[in-house]
């Protein structure tokens, strides 16, 4: 295995032991934790529409599950959809997480953070109305499909999902099962991630590791293609929602491993309108994909520094892919941001900065700028509305590095 994986593991281990020592005093009292480490509700979306959300579990009868104990079952895909809704409200009245106790258990285990520090997660609220009625009189609206990162969740970028939906977009996001932090299907059936480096057998060679990651990438990409197929037959699944969905106007968006997932999908799904990658992990993409033409309008937003990846090939692969793209590619590198600034994780509490999980950038200002960039870009590429100029981007972000190809 490459040295940068050993280095990353060492850094994570240091953080695992450092955090509990600093906060040991607070773990004994939930009341103190809630006061010292409050977690904020999601911000109210700025668009004109109230937002509804629905959750489905779809079965792909064309594919068997890819992990051993499930290899005799068809792959199941949990999907959440955000959309403009009829009526409703922008009040914070819905829970952010379906299963907060499971979420606390996963985060506590993965980062060795005392669960008592995460108690406030179950109190986080969002303005999206669960099982709201789609605003069908809007007619067909553009679709965005989102792919989460390694160990992430379908709702890890809910702030962006709600913002886009409030501006008239329909957003589908799935849990990549066995890659998502956890998936609860029903009752006591919980499927945890088996995709981290620690899940690989001891003695796994570098070649074996990347062969597995390429297979992993393909399965994730097939998940996205399956969602596209399901959208085509949505009138038999949810007739009201189908009236809003323009299946001929689909864009993709992904964070981290989700970034390479949507980029890989572009090579199989030729009708995609545009694509946004948030701090993409491109290392799993094989050379034969990197050297192809994605032929799609593409925007990448990410960190200015390469320290997180500890491997210059992540940037080099992105550069190569961009150079081979025959359509417009724009890369935005934002100073003082880190990997998890491009998800909801950075918004909930200042403590993420204290432990170096997120960057020094002002989280509220960055959220507003990021949301504005996403809305402006999709308006430009999916609706032919407005403009997406480098000058406007610089006004929003200030000191950034912008590369346009």
What are these regions (language model features)?
Residues 33-143, 363, 374:
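Domain-level recognition of soluble alpha/beta enzyme cores
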Residues 34-45, 52, 61, 68-69, ...:
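Alpha/beta-hydrolase-fold serine-hydrolase catalytic core, especially in secreted/extracellular enzymes
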Residues 85-88, 95-112, 155-204, 335:
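Active-site machinery of serine-nucleophile hydrolases
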Residues 273-339:
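The feature captures the conserved acid-bearing segment of alpha/beta-hydrolase catalytic domains
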